[in-house]
Structures are given as C-alpha cells and as structure tokens.
C-alpha cells in the first residue's frame, strides 16, 4: 500500500517555481485580508458571483450541466431541481454552502469527508451516499477513436478504509509540523485522495470541496470570492495532465507531487489575480462607468457575461453595460454569452 508521508515538504528541496508561487499567493492573501475589512460590500457582491460560478464550474468538469439561468435559480434557492443533473447541482450547492459557513466548526476527518459526500449526493439518490465504495473502480479515458484505456487504478475497495485513515493521520501529522507550509500540504493531500478514489462516484467534486475547506483552514479564503472550481474547469486539460503526471508510481511510493502542486498553486494564483483585478475595477470610482465595464471584461481571466458584469458593478445599469462597444471587447475574446 502507498505510504502517506509528507515529510518531504520539510526538507527544503522544493522547485523554485513552487516557492515563488507560494510567496506571491501569500502576499496576495495579505492584501485581500486588508481590503476586505474596509470594503465589505464589494466582497459581498463578489461572493454572490463566485458561489454560482463554483457550483457551475465544478459540476461542468464532470459533465453535469444545465442552463446558466437554471443554475442561478437553483443556487439562489429560487427553484427546486427538475431532473437528475439539477439534483446533483443542488447537492453541490448544499455542500459548498456548508463549507463556506461552517468550516470553522469542522475538522478534517473521515467522518467529515463522508458527511460532505452525503450532503453532495443525497438529493440525487445515490445508493452509497456518504459511504465508501464497495467495488473496485478504475479511472478511464476515451481517445478520439472512442477506445477506452485505464488511466489509473485506484486503491481497492477492500483497502479504502485503511487508506483514508492513513491519509487523515498523515495530514494531521504534517499540519502540526511548524516547518511545513500548510499551503503546500493541501495539493499533496488532494492528490492522494484522488488516487484512493474512495467513492463510487463524486470523487472529483468532493476533492474540490475539500480543497476549499483545507484552504479555509490554512487561512486562504479566496475561493469564497472567486471560483476556484471555475479556474480548474477553464484549464481542465492542464489539470488532468498534472494529475496524471503526479500519480505515476503512486502505488509504489515513487511518484512526485510537484506537477500537481504547481498546477494547484497556479490555479490559486489566478484566483487572486482575478480578485485583485475585479476589486480594482469595482473600486475605480474615478473611471467613467463605460470604462469600468470595459476594464471588468478586459481584466477578467475568465469569460464574463453581461449579468455577471451587472453583479460586479451594481451601480452601473444594464443599459450602460449594453451600450459598451462589444465589437471592441470581442476582439479580446473574453466576453461570454451576452
């Protein structure tokens, strides 16, 4: 069985790119904490947008989709889910809301992980909701010719309970080591969780919820204001490449966590960049309203819709947003579904 050991994070032999990304993210986080105290209304608006984008993005990665209008209605509680996909979406909403609102009261444990899975899958009627898999599973991919191949063989169902116990204990041991940067520990734990693949379904979505939770516990709350899940969805090919690279040799303890760590930190860095740009745009009171609309779109890392612009800039009317030259904005290929 794989040995869960994060002591390499204490050895000071990390790639320069990882060290630099960590330092930059830490600096961004400090700036955000300072801004948040004196700009609560702005952060409240950003939180509303991120909540919808997180539910949409995390489910879209798994092919669980509906219209943008329906997602917003479900996330805002304005409509009950109408089909299986919408029940999956509503379940993710419930689990996400619990992490956002109750992370201070929760601890990383097997019971917590099982509870998050149960909350996420309960509405969709999963037979094994909140329970580990009872049969072995495989991670497969389909090539352009429709042929399947095994991408990774997770831990067997028989060994899943022990593996999850060892994962949690290894996390606790590393978390309590003052020489280990907690931010670097998170992607290592998430990679191991995905290699165990403890559930019959929902592992990817649970991994993203756990990422947000562990970020909260380590003092990083950017995922509340910019969707971490949507960043992954926007670059999912690179995400899966990093995941595969870091899982090679996992069962024999010969894998390297570095590629997945770099990908995780890069996504987090993009979240902070997006937060910084959105804050600067919303806070740019000296700009004309049309200029603020343009800056919102052009500074956005991800495509942004008209409705989202109106949410980001609540003092700008929808008619003003529509009056902006979309021809100019489309040239930058960042405006989505106006």
Describe these PLM feature segments.
Residues 335-337:
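N-terminal low-complexity segments that are often proline-rich with Ser/Thr-Pro
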Residues 1-333:
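FIC/Doc superfamily catalytic core
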């Amino acid at each position: 069985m794989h040995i869960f050991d994060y002591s390499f994070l204490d050895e000071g032999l990390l790639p320069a790119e990882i060290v630099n990304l960590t330092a930059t993210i830490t600096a961004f986080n400090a700036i955000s904490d300072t801004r948040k105290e004196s700009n609560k209304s702005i952060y409240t608006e950003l939180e509303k947008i991120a909540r919808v984008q997180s539910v949409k993005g995390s489910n879209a990665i798994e092919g669980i989709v509906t219209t943008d209008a329906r997602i917003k209605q479900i996330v805002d509680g304005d409509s009950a889910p109408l089909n299986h996909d919408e029940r999956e979406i509503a379940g993710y909403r419930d689990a996400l809301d619990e992490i956002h609102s109750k992370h201070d009261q929760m601890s990383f444990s097997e019971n917590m992980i099982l509870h998050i899975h149960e909350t996420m899958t309960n509405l969709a009627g999963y037979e094994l909701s909140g329970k580990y898999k009872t049969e072995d599973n495989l991670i497969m991919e389909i090539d352009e010719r429709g042929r399947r191949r095994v991408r990774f063989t997770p831990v067997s169902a028989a060994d899943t309970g022990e593996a999850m116990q060892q994962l949690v204990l290894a996390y606790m041991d590393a978390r309590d080591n003052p020489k280990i940067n907690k931010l670097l520990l998170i992607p290592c734990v998430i990679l191991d969780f995905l290699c165990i693949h403890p559930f019959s379904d929902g592992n990817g979505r649970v991994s993203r919820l756990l990422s947000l939770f562990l970020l909260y516990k380590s003092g990083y709350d950017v995922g509340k204001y910019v969707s971490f899940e949507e960043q992954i969805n926007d670059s999912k090919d690179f995400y899966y490449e990093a995941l595969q690279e870091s899982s090679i040799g996992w069962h024999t303890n010969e894998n390297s966590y570095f590629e997945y760590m770099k990908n995780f930190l890069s996504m987090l860095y993009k979240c902070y960049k997006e937060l910084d740009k959105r804050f600067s745009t919303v806070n740019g009171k000296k700009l004309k309203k049309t200029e603020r609309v343009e800056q919102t779109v052009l500074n956005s890392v991800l495509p942004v819709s008209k409705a989202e612009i109106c949410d980001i800039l609540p003092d700008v009317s929808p008619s003003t947003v529509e009056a902006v030259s979309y021809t100019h904005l489309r040239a930058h290929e960042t405006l989505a579904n106006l």
